[in-house]
Amino acid sequence: MKEEIPLDKLIDLIINDYDRERIETGIKRQIMVQENKEPDYLPLFLHGKIPEMDRFPSYDRRDQFYDPEKMLYTLLWGCLSIIRGKADNIPCVRVNFGTGFLATVFGLEQQIFPDKMPWLKSHLEIEKIMKMQIEDLEPLEDKGLIPQWKRYTDFYREKLKDIPFIKMYLPDTQGVFDLAHLVAGD
């Protein structure tokens, strides 16, 4: 029997505490700062502990890595904390496969831990990298963790369709130099 994950109960808590005006004000303040304009005050980013969490299950990072429902559920606790904090944060979630996410496109695998973020098991030799062709990475949507990312993203979209104030953002793709370091090592 599949374990019941109380995702819908958590979504109900979020919807009940949502303050549209509060979120819109936070977004406006952040936009003003990004556009080098002066807001009424600098955005404040606050959140705190959620008392209800003690009555709900929790899932470690390994559980989340292999289950989109557990990952989204865990991330939504942060969104509830932001909403209750009534600061200028924007509640948001992402598929969180760790910094090695894009490196898996090159055929690298990550070690998955219960208590910390995933980490690459190995690197590619420079000689192999130098011989790679674009065709080696195609079709990109079938490589590495990209199919899982798409599946998790589709799941998130479906579950969040009635709460558009929770934004989705990109997984940790790293910059080009960090990605090169992850793939090639030192």
Protein language model regions, located:
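Catalytic cores of TIM-barrel enzymes
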Residues: 1-186
